[in-house]
Swiss-Prot record:
This is Energy-dependent translational throttle protein EttA. It catalyses: ATP + H2O = ADP + phosphate + H(+). One of its GO terms (molecular function) is tRNA binding. It comes from Haemophilus influenzae (strain ATCC 51907 / DSM 11121 / KW20 / Rd). ATP 1 binds at G40, L41, N42, G43, A44, G45, K46, S47. The gene is ettA. InterPro entries: AAA+_ATPase, ABC_tran_Xtn, ABC_transporter-like_ATP-bd, ABC_transporter-like_CS, EttA, P-loop_NTPase.
Length: 556
């Protein structure tokens, strides 16, 4: 293996039941300092590839090995942490060498007071310890820990791991890994469970990171701003593309032109995203306003019939009237924490509202109040007479693992009636990228992203005209994300979407609802980038820096 590479794979293959070649004959070499984003459909083998590279999965064909002496750090989708540890104890494992050096240095200083000490030996040890501390900026160790904890919005230092949610555990594991500073980072969906500000911080951190980074992610701004290479997994093959995500889109469109006969819908979807990428910010802003202006056209039967040829199609519900949702002076608390404090806003016809904020800030609580599942402490929610809600929540466990994909959606019916439309059930399921034999897969065999698509297919068949989408982008591959964006943009109704995906919010949002500290929620007209720019101008750069969320305490 050439010393110019930190890692080499030679003819790597992987077979999974029932005799499916998920990876085929992959040969790749990784440069020091390279930043690589891994793309591919759900189930394409992205996580398998990282497990092989991390040395976790040893059952594969071919060779995969790092350069001798290279330290590899791996973030799996479900990292393992010691349940009895506190958050601080778990994170400090990453800097144990520096902490031990600091402790020992204090002991060495104390030993100088002994007149019988071997001063030459102590001086040599002192020099060695100081070199370790200086290399890791050890005298500022506490500041490093606090900055990282704030940036990733970690729970309190004293919180026990066993009491944390899955998302909180992932953030702790990510923080620990980044502080270790290995030569090569293997990250499986590092942006999952991070809010937009934490993702932006991670993006800057990895952009400046001196080591090699291989990241599976669906965050396309992340792929645009960090990645210098895209590794696409397509039908078992690993195809490297030099450039970032936007560059990959350009190259991919040219390749699809050569496969036009079989890829028409996919090419149409990529072309729409490319059109958006090529627009300047003013053009993007004008496009979001144009969506609301052409609301009547979106509602026409002829337009929706044309729209049915898209990759993913959200069936329209009843025609929406002028009044949609009005929220006035809404307040909601749990225990002594105020989640929402005096919130008022009005959703105009045709709006797509992106909802952002830290995990646990109360975004899903708002949806439960809008749908009548919970009541506010004070204030009111008023729905227009024509409003029919369709809700897609972030929990996808309410499916029967023994059923096939087709059975789960269709309940055995050949024809589905969705809103004012009738559609063959297999064609409808196919719209969510379950083609042919994939419709016969058991639900229990699906990957996280495939479950996400199935969940969308089930709940969108209700045919509402106002969609409440709670983290619909979680675990979706980039292809499905793009199709979902296009489907929402063509939907003849309104949508409120909880998401941390900045690219997604920039493409679809006409308004932003931002959950800040102490129950303060801001309603802004414009997409995510417009809102961030406004925040910087209004509140300064500090406003867009992540920090651990503060809850307003209720006066006793």
């Amino acid at each position: 293996m050439s010393s110019q590479f930190v890692y080499t794979m030679h003819r790597v293959g992987k077979v999974v039941p029932p005799k499916r070649h998920i990876l085929k004959d992959i040969s790749l070499s990784f440069f020091p300092g390279a930043k690589i984003g891994v793309l591919g459909l759900n189930g394409a083998g992205k996580s398998t590839l990282l497990r092989i590279m991390a040395g976790v999965d040893k059952e594969f064909e071919g060779e995969a090995r790092p350069q001798p002496g290279i330290k590899i750090g791996y973030l799996p989708q479900e990292p393992k942490l010691e349940p009895q540890q506190t958050v601080r104890e778990a994170v400090e494992e990453a800097v144990s060498e520096v902490k031990n050096a600091l402790t020992r240095l204090d002991e060495v200083y104390a030993l100088y007071a002994d007149p019988d000490a071997d001063f030459d030996k102590l001086a040599a040890e002192q020099a060695n310890l100081e070199a370790i501390i200086q290399a890791h900026d050890g005298h500022n160790l506490d500041n490093q820990l606090e900055r990282a904890a704030d940036a990733l919005r970690l729970p309190d230092w004293d919180a026990k791991i066993e009491h944390l949610s899955g998302g909180e555990r992932r953030r702790v594991a990510l923080c620990r890994l980044l502080l270790e500073k290995p030569d090569m980072l293997l990250l499986d969906e590092p942006t999952n469970h991070l809010d937009a500000e934490s993702v932006a911080w991670l993006e800057r951190f990895l952009h400046d990171y001196e080591g090699t980074v291989v990241a599976i992610t669906h965050d396309r701004y992340f792929l645009d701003n960090v990645a210098g290479w895209i590794l696409e997994l397509d039908r078992g093959e690993g195809i490297p593309w030099e450039g970032n995500y936007s560059s990959w889109l350009e190259q991919k469109e040219k390749r699809l032109e050569q496969e036009q006969a079989t890829e028409n819908a996919r090419q149409k979807s990529i072309a729409k995203e490319l059109e958006w990428v090529r627009q300047n910010p003013k053009g993007r802003q004008a496009k979001s306003k144009a969506r609301m202006a052409r609301f009547d056209e979106l509602n026409s039967g002829e337009y929706q019939k044309r729209n049915e040829t898209n990759e993913l199609f959200i069936p329209p519900g009843p025609r929406l009237g002028d009044k949609v949702i009005e929220v006035q002076n809404l307040t909601k608390s749990y225990g002594d924490r105020t989640l929402i404090d005096d919130l008022s806003f009005s959703i105009p016809k045709g709006a797509i509202v992106g909802i952002i904020g830290a995990n646990g800030a109360g975004k899903s609580t708002l949806f439960r109040m809008l749908s009548g599942q919970e009541q506010p402490d004070s204030g009111s929610v008023t729905m227009g007479e024509t409003v029919v809600l369709a809700s897609v929540d972030q929990f996808r466990d309410s499916m029967d693992d023994k059923k096939t994909v087709w059975e789960e959606v269709s309940n055995g019916q050949d024809i589905l009636t969705i809103g004012n439309f009738e559609i063959p059930s297999r064609a409808y399921v196919g719209r969510f990228n379950f083609k042919g034999v994939d419709q016969q897969k058991r639900v229990g065999e699906l990957s996280g992203g495939e479950r996400g698509r199935l969940h969308l297919a089930k709940l969108l068949q209700r045919g509402g005209n106002v969609l409440l989408l709670d983290e619909p982008t979680n675990d979706l591959d980039v292809e499905t994300l793009r199709a979902l964006e296009n489907a929402i943009l063509e939907f003849p109704g309104c949508a409120m979407v909880i998401s941390h995906d900045r690219w997604f919010l920039d493409r679809i949002a006409t308004h932003i609802l931002d959950y800040g500290d102490e129950g303060k929620v801001t309603f802004y007209e414009g997409n995510f980038s417009d809102y961030e720019e406004w925040k910087k101008k209004t509140l300064g750069d500090a406003a867009t820096q992540p920090h651990r969320i503060k809850y307003k305490r209720i006066a006793k």
